[in-house]
Every structure is written in C-alpha cells, then in structure tokens.
C-alpha cells in the first residue's frame, strides 16, 4: 500500500508529464549541486528539472500514458519537464552536456512520441520556433513583393509595346482614339 507522500509524488509527476510538451530523461551521476543549479538556470522558466525516484516516475509516466520510457528508469535519473519551446530546452541540455560530460541524455518524449538520445540531439540542432516562423514570414513577404512588382509591370509593358507598335509602323495601323489616349497617358 503506497504511503500518502508517495501517492502525492506520483500525482505531481503525472501532472508534470501531462502538462508538459516534452520530457527529457537524463543521468546526472557525478554532477555537483552547483552544476545542477546552473543547469536549472540554463533551462529557464520553460522547463522544470527534477531529480526523481525511478519507481515513482515510472508509475507516473505509465499513468500519463507514456510507457516507452520504462527501460530508461535506471540509475540516477532526473527529468526535464518542458512546457515551452522544446528546441530551446534541448539546446540548453545539449550545451550543458558538452561542458559537463557527466550529464547524459538518456531519452525523452515529445507530444507523446518517444525520442532517443540522438533524436533529442537532432532536435537541439533545429532553429527555434520563432526563427523558423520569421523565415517563413520573410519567404511569404518576398513572394508577395515579387507578385506585386509583376502585376505592376504588366500594364507598363503593355503601354511600351503599344507605343513601339504605333511608332514603328504608322502606315500599317492607325490607332483608335482610346488607344491614342492610353499611349499619351503613359
């Protein structure tokens, strides 16, 4: 029979799994308290980094519908519950792991899909959501300005062609009054 404290911990962890966009399991063996504090700061407000008990976390993950991480709950485990941009948090974890080789990224879950350590590192290599959105907006803006210049060029090109036609062969065709007005207006 679980104790009330353990039941409360499982409920809290289950809520963390359900309310986060992503969760990354890490092994923190050999890291000092100061290094863990630095890691928490680097993750920022969009992620909560918690040292957890494997059994309770495994139960909470299963209750939240996440069973793909079961094999990774071994050894000293901590979980980064990510509520913001998963790319930024993955970058923070990757960069911290480069500087502190004792931090090992084990696995993770993103929107219910299990991720390997390599997939998390690939996620960290992506540009942030804001950068990708700004690139997309820039691409749309560029296409709109190209279309606008094309539409502006069509009438002026027509008028230039009509002027050339009128000046090159006055004997072949006599422009109508409306065509003359259009040519003189340009």
Curated annotation (Swiss-Prot):
GO terms for cellular component: large ribosomal subunit. Signal peptide: none annotated. The keyword rRNA-binding applies. It comes from the Bacteria. One of its GO terms (molecular function) is structural constituent of ribosome. Keywords: Ribonucleoprotein, Ribosomal protein, RNA-binding, rRNA-binding. Pfam families: Ribosomal_L10 (PF00466). PROSITE patterns: RIBOSOMAL_L10. GO terms for biological process: translation. SUPFAM superfamilies: Ribosomal protein L10-like (SSF160369). Part of the ribosomal stalk of the 50S ribosomal subunit. The N-terminus interacts with L11 and the large rRNA to form the base of the stalk. The C-terminus forms an elongated spine to which L12 dimers bind in a sequential fashion forming a multimeric L10(L12)X complex. Forms part of the ribosomal stalk, playing a central role in the interaction of the ribosome with GTP-bound translation factors. Belongs to the universal ribosomal protein uL10 family. This is Large ribosomal subunit protein uL10. It comes from Streptomyces virginiae (Streptomyces cinnamonensis). The gene is rplJ.
């Amino acid at each position: 029979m679980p104790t009330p404290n353990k039941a409360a911990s499982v409920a809290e962890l289950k809520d963390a799994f359900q309310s986060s966009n992503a969760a990354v399991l890490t092994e923190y063996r050999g890291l000092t308290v100061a290094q863990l504090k630095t890691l928490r700061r680097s993750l920022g407000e969009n992620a909560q980094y918690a040292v957890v008990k494997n059994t309770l976390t495994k139960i909470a993950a299963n209750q939240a519908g996440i069973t793909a991480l079961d094999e990774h709950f071994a050894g000293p485990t901590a979980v980064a519950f990510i509520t913001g941009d998963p790319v930024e948090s993955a970058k923070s974890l990757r960069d911290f792991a480069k500087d502190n080789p004792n931090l090992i990224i084990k696995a993770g879950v993103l929107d219910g899909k299990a991720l390997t350590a390599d997939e998390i590192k690939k996620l960290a290599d992506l540009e942030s959501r804001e950068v990708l959105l700004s690139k997309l907006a820039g691409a749309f803006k560029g296409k709109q300005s190209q279309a606008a210049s094309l539409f502006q060029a069509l009438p002026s090109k027509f008028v230039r062609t009509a002027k050339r036609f009128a000046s090159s062969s006055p004997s072949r065709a006599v422009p109508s009054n409306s065509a003359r007005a259009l040519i003189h207006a340009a």
